[in-house]
Amino acid sequence: MVFIQKRIYVYINLMNLYQNKVLVAMPNMVDSFFSKSVVVITKETSETVEGIILNKPVSQVKLSSLSFEENETAQQEKILKKLISQSGRLFFGGPVDFSTASFLDVGSSKDRLSFDEIVIARDFSFFQKVLFGENKNQRLYFGKSVWGRGQLFEEIASGDWLLKDFDPQTINMEAKIMWEFLISSLGLETYTFIGEGGRS
């Protein structure tokens, strides 16, 4: 017979579980949007987790896979697609909500990242100014990534993502080397596994 002298209860705070974290896609990720992606968590509620992919220029994403909002005119959509194809400052933030973009001034992000959301149709002139202005530290992230809390937890548990403390200086890396650098820093190789995940 076992006599219990003291019972210790451990309470896990599930809120803020992803605060100041970054998701690094495992090499087995085959989802076309999230393969080799680095996602910084920007918002967390009791039901959902939101983030922005940091390392995918929109030029790498097939424009045919992007659906624009109905409130954008055909002319705006045509101009928008032209801007996307020409600018190196527009990044693909995720496959949700293409009516908005998240603005980031890299030069002011020394200790943390601070994103400002803009509505493209309403702030179209600002949108163009950022993409073609003189300040090369300014970036726009088109769309965002959204998961249900349970969905993201399951994807991490199944090995689709690695959860890592986020260093804001990561944003200064070239997009094409960011993912490989973080994977290597975690002691993993970039060979391919079999698997899938990351559906937002």
Model-derived segments and spans:
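A short aromatic-anchored loop/beta-hairpin motif
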Residues: 14-141, 145-200
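N-terminal amphipathic/basic-hydrophobic helices that include classical n-h-c signal peptides
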Residues: 1-14
